[in-house]
């Protein structure tokens, strides 16, 4: 009479686990280690659920974890799997928070240096402090030197073109305007010059 009572205890205990733990609802009534294999399969299917269901399952696993691990060896898989689920949820949260490639583009637009080049520049500065800057400097420097030479050549040609030409008559008045202290002297000098050019022989 003692032998038929023992098999009835294991299914009752398994039924109690099925009612309490939602993650172990798919447990079979096989004896030995077979009844924990479906539990592992159901645990690997947890990431397919929605985040709200994962949070509920994780809360129940946290509440029932210590009591189950003390009695039976099967639920030892729950803490590690729980950590992996939390890690996956963290990844999903970071991806949704940053917004994928668009957030990377906005960050590279607003920030002066991308995240990867800062580390590379730090390594280059440790090896040789001026190498990272001198790589990009010479092309700009050469272009600036070429541009300066062209400007000097054009300005020299522009100034040389006026050397053979006669000086304009208004150049004297321009110098007098700079040196004179008032408009009266400018008007008098201009009036005297015009009278002299008019052919007044007594003045000459």
Swiss-Prot record:
Location in the cell: Mitochondrion outer membrane; Cytoplasm
Gene Ontology CC terms, in alphabetical order: BAD-BCL-2 complex; cytoplasm; cytosol; mitochondrial outer membrane; mitochondrion
Effect after changing residue 155 to D: No pro-apoptotic activity, no interaction with Bcl-X(L)
Major subcellular site: mitochondrion
Signal peptide bounds: none
Polar residues bias locations: 85-97
Modified residue annotations for Asymmetric dimethylarginine: 131, 133
Modified residues (Phosphoserine): 67, 112, 128, 134, 136, 155, 170
Keyword set includes Phosphoprotein: yes
Region (Disordered): 1-138, 160-179
A Pfam family it matches: Bcl-2_BAD
Family of the protein in this entry: Belongs to the Bcl-2 family.
Subunit annotation: Forms heterodimers with the anti-apoptotic proteins, Bcl-X(L), Bcl-2 and Bcl-W. Also binds protein S100A10. The Ser-112/Ser-136 phosphorylated form binds 14-3-3 proteins. Interacts with AKT1 and PIM3. Interacts (via BH3 domain) with NOL3 (via CARD domain); preventing the association of BAD with BCL2. Interacts with HIF3A isoform 2 (via C-terminus domain); the interaction reduces the binding between BAD and BAX. Interacts with GIMAP3/IAN4 and GIMAP5/IAN5.
UniProt name for this protein: Bcl2-associated agonist of cell death
Organism of this sequence: Mus musculus (Mouse)
